[in-house]
Design a protein with these regions (language model features):
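Active-site catalytic microenvironments for nucleophilic, acid-base chemistry
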Residues: 54, 156-160
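Short beta-strand immediately N-terminal to the catalytic nucleophile in serine-hydrolase-like folds
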Residues: 139-142, 183
Length: 264
């Protein structure tokens, strides 16, 4: 099947379940790879579309995806009167569950619905099935909960035949993405295949975090190394897991992108 550049109308059938914002290269016909971006908890696709435009990867079509469900106003500290108003705060989980230990939202709320929509419909049904791309043409980038989703989808891809809702299109998925970047997001246990004889996932991954990361501690890194063939870790000097704030923090991400764009 010949490859063609996706158009906005290719994704309209996903609405309102899934909404995307697309950022094309300056010359769309130069597109050779696709970057799919997942924002963090409580954000929206708009900010990550802007991020993609700012980094301006050559020959890369960026698709920033909106979280699958809105956050309740109460969790955002907003008055109940805003409950019926349009929101710009979304999340990726199947549910919103508070930890009994910390009172914070559980980092692994289950991602079955996001997996079905993003991997089953956006990636296989549209990018692969309709437009003729391969999974090794596709990079993933996520922050926080979105980073966990990026790692989880990369983990699940090694068992493509078992994926939830992956039924659209008539082309099979490959077993690895071109690469995946997670900032501050851990690999969700719910997205690790259950087979004890499973092979390691083939997607090269880069995880970036602060020195006092809440989720990407030594155990989380060990888990990644058990589940993926190629894991790179960047520990920033800053304490938290916020998005890159300067050239020094962004440099390893850009180097990873450059390497992966040269691959295959």
């Amino acid at each position: 099947m010949p490859t063609r550049i996706p158009k906005p109308e290719d994704f309209t059938y996903l609405e309102p379940s899934l909404n995307v914002s697309m950022v094309f290269p300056e010359i769309p016909e130069t597109t050779t790879s696709i970057l799919v971006l997942f924002h963090g908890l409580g954000d929206s696709e708009a900010s990550f579309a802007k991020f993609a435009k700012n980094i301006n990867l050559p020959g890369v079509l960026a698709i920033s995806v909106r979280g699958i469900s809105p956050l309740p106003p109460a969790l955002l500290g907003l008055p109940g009167s805003e409950a019926g108003q349009p929101t710009s705060h979304f999340h990726w989980g199947d549910d919103l569950t508070l930890s009994s230990d910390t009172g914070d939202l559980e980092p692994d709320p289950g991602f079955s619905k996001a997996e079905e929509l993003v991997l089953g419909k956006l990636i296989q049904g549209t990018l692969v099935g309709k437009c003729g791309w391969e999974t090794n043409d596709i990079l993933l980038f996520g922050f926080g909960q979105g980073g966990s989703l990026a790692l989880g989808l990369s983990s699940k891809l090694r068992k493509a035949e078992e994926l939830v809702g992956v039924t659209e299109g008539n082309r099979e998925l490959g077993l690895a993405f071109k690469g995946a970047v997670s900032i501050g997001g851990q690999l969700p246990s719910s997205m690790i295949p259950s087979s004890s004889a499973r092979s390691k996932a083939g997607t090269p991954v880069l995880v970036c975090h602060g020195r006092n990361s809440e989720l990407l501690d030594s155990e989380a890194i060990e888990l990644l190394n058990r589940e993926f063939v190629d894991v790179r870790e960047v520990k920033w000097m800053k304490a938290d897991d916020s998005m890159p704030r300067n050239r020094h923090e962004m440099l390893p991400i850009m180097q990873f992108f450059a390497e992966r764009l040269r691959a295959w």
